[in-house]
C-alpha cells in the first residue's frame, strides 16, 4: 500500500457474530479531521507513524505511532491529524454480538479507549491482511471475520489485559500506565487508577514493584 488511502466497505454486516464493516489505510494530510460525529459500529485505528488528537466525552488523547484507539458506536467523537506530523494509520470497523466482550478483554474502556503496546509490525500486518481479503462473497466475509478475530487476539495478547478477573500483575501495570498516560491532564489520582484497573492500592503497588 503506497498511496494515501485505500478502503473497503462491506455491504453485508449482520451475517455473523462478528462482521467487518469497513477496513483500510490512510496517510492523512495535516489537520485532516473527522467529526464531531458518531459511528454506528466499533472502529479501531492503529497508528503507524505521525501523531494526532482523539477527543471523546471522557477525555482528550494525544496519540502517536504505536497507539491504537477505539471508537465506540453512537458516541460523539472527533479525531484530528497533527499539523506538522500527521498520522498514518490502518483501521477496521466491525459489529456483532461478540464485539463488546472481546474489546473489553483486550483492555479497551470508554474511560480509556487507547492501548499503547509494542506490536512491532504484527498488528499492522494483520489489519492489512483483512483489507487484502476484502470482498462481498460469503467466503470473503468469513475470511475477513477470521482475520479480524486474529487481529483482536493480537490486541488481547499484547495489551496484557486478558480479562478483568484474571489479569496478571503485568496486566495491571500495563492497564494502569495506559490510563495514566492518557488521562493525566484531568488531575487523576491513585484511587482513579486503582478503580479503573479494578484492584486495591496495595495490589497495584505490588504489581508496579514486580514490573
Model-predicted regions and their roles:
Residues 2, 6-8, 15-110:
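N-terminal regulatory/effector-sensing and dimerization cores
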Residues 27-28, 75, 155, 180, ...:
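Generic helix-packing signal
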Residues 95-101, 117-182, 203-205:
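An amphipathic alpha-helical interaction segment
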Residues 110-116:
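Short, charged recognition helix plus adjacent turn
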Residues 186-211:
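Basic/polar phosphate-binding segments, predominantly the helix-turn-helix DNA-binding elements
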Amino acid at each position: 500500500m503506497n498511496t494515501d488511502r485505500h478502503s473497503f466497505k462491506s455491504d453485508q454486516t449482520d451475517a455473523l457474530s462478528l462482521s467487518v464493516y469497513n477496513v483500510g489505510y490512510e496517510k492523512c494530510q495535516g489537520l485532516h479531521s473527522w467529526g464531531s460525529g458518531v459511528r454506528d459500529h466499533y472502529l479501531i485505528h492503529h497508528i503507524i507513524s505521525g501523531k494526532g488528537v482523539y477527543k471523546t466525552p471522557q477525555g482528550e488523547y494525544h496519540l502517536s505511532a504505536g497507539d491504537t484507539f477505539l471508537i465506540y458506536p453512537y458516541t460523539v467523537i472527533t479525531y484530528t491529524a497533527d499539523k506538522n506530523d500527521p498520522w498514518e494509520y490502518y483501521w477496521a470497523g466491525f459489529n456483532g454480538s461478540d464485539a463488546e466482550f472481546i474489546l473489553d478483554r483486550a483492555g479497551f474502556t470508554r474511560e480509556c479507549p487507547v492501548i499503547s503496546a509494542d506490536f512491532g509490525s504484527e498488528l499492522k500486518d494483520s489489519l492489512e491482511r483483512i483489507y487484502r481479503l476484502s470482498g462481498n462473497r460469503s467466503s470473503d466475509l468469513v475470511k475477513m471475520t477470521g482475520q479480524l478475530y486474529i487481529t483482536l487476539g493480537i490486541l488481547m495478547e499484547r495489551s496484557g489485559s486478558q480479562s478483568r478477573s484474571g489479569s496478571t500483575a503485568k496486566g495491571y501495570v500495563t492497564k494502569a500506565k495506559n490510563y495514566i498516560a492518557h488521562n493525566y491532564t484531568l488531575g487523576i489520582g491513585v484511587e482513579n487508577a486503582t478503580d479503573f484497573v479494578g484492584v486495591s492500592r496495595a495490589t497495584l503497588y505490588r504489581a508496579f514493584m514486580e514490573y
